[in-house]
Amino acid sequence: MKQAVHFGAGNIGRGFIAPILQANDYEVIFVDVNTDLIKQINEERQYKVTSLNIDGATEEKINDVKAIDLGDTEILNETLLNASLITTSVGPKFVESIYERVATLDNQKDQIFIAFENMYKASSSASSSINSRNKNLKIIDAVVDKIVPPQPPTSL
């Protein structure tokens, strides 16, 4: 199975990006700074996403997820080297530092970096100011405009 590392285990990451990644056969590994959330994700390994549409509410179960603390450098770097897709939903001001971390790894395999942020060309903006050693890192721009209301704490 392909591996995706997603920075940001908040509402957009868990409620929007992870379901799309899993629907496309990616194993999802979240990276976050919230140690309680990281612990909960790693203990439960699953959560539910409730979506509302014109026909009412639908519930989707997201399975087999993991999380890594941003400060756990050794495990994070090893995980990043194995990932084929690296994504973010952390807020535009943090994308450049994440891109720099990925771009300075000496990776020999093809990887894709997508910043799913509420900012035009967030991926390109981050990559334009960083000299990448990773020549196999491809940049894709995306803009996210989806409202994910706060989820109850019991739903992870």
Question: Where do the PLM segments sit?
Answer:
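Substrate/ligand-engaging "lid" and interaction regions
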Residues: 2-5, 11-156
